[in-house]
């Protein structure tokens, strides 16, 4: 992982884990993963902005199944009209990539699952906030 983004240090994983299940015919259209403040569990409840000093900059996908066909993650370096780069992630692997306003963000998409069921977990790598990292956030948010 990148130790610094915009001069801000990595501070760990977001406590907000999202679980996804893709069945045959399911897909995820081209999109931009959002950049979010760090979450934490406080008194048994998820608090969305628990710290005030960190934002996510990288997506992490954890692959929990391998007995499916299709469902590759595709990245579009030149936008949706350009050529896609397909990435097959086998069972037990992790895929990490920049999101939000990060200058190296390439919009991802999830190919249609043809057979079987694809299970993944998504979370984020959190980074501190600096004037440079704030510029990265503003490019995405506004």
What positions do the PLM features span?
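Fe(II)/2-oxoglutarate oxygenase catalytic core
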Residues: 1-94, 101-142
């Amino acid at each position: 992982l990148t130790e610094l983004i915009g001069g801000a240090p990595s501070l760990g994983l977001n406590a907000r884990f999202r679980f996804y299940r893709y069945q045959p015919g399911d897909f995820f259209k081209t999109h931009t993963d959002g950049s979010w403040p760090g979450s934490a569990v406080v008194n048994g409840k998820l608090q969305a902005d628990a710290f005030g000093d960190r934002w996510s900059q990288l997506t992490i996908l954890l692959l929990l199944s391998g007995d499916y066909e299709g469902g590759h993650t595709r990245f579009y370096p030149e936008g949706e009209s350009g050529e896609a780069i397909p990435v097959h992630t086998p069972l037990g692997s992790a895929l990490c990539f920049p999101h939000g306003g990060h200058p190296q963000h390439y919009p991802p998409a999830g190919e249609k699952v043809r057979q079987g069921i694809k299970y993944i977990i998504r979370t984020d790598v959190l980074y501190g906030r600096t004037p440079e990292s704030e510029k990265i956030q503003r490019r995405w948010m506004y």
